[in-house]
Amino acid sequence: MGMRMMFTVFLLVVLTTTVVSFPSDSASDGRDDEAKDERSDIYESKRDGRCCHPACGKYYSCGR
């Protein structure tokens, strides 16, 4: 393969990768918004001193 052919193949790979990655970025933005909404609901709920994280579970009751 000549240098021109290798450069052309390189450009095709870069352009294909760029075009394929754009739709997946826009799809993940919608999922991120939904996840943020769910997370805000968790923070608004009353915990009453409960912690469900394994590191602090021995000090606080999880309530599950």
From Swiss-Prot:
It holds the Pfam family Toxin_8. The modification Cysteine amide is found at C62. GO terms for molecular function: acetylcholine receptor inhibitor activity; toxin activity. InterPro entries: Conotoxin_a-typ, Conotoxin_a-typ_CS. Expressed by the venom duct. Disulfide bonds join C51-C56, C52-C62. Keywords: Amidation, Disulfide bond, Secreted, Signal, Toxin. One of its GO terms (cellular component) is extracellular region. It is found in: Secreted. Residues 1-21 form the signal peptide. Residues 22-49 form a propeptide. Its main location: secreted. PROSITE patterns: ALPHA_CONOTOXIN. The keyword Transferase does not apply. Found in injectable (milked) (IV) venom. Belongs to the conotoxin A superfamily. This is Alpha-conotoxin CnIL. It comes from Conus consors (Singed cone).
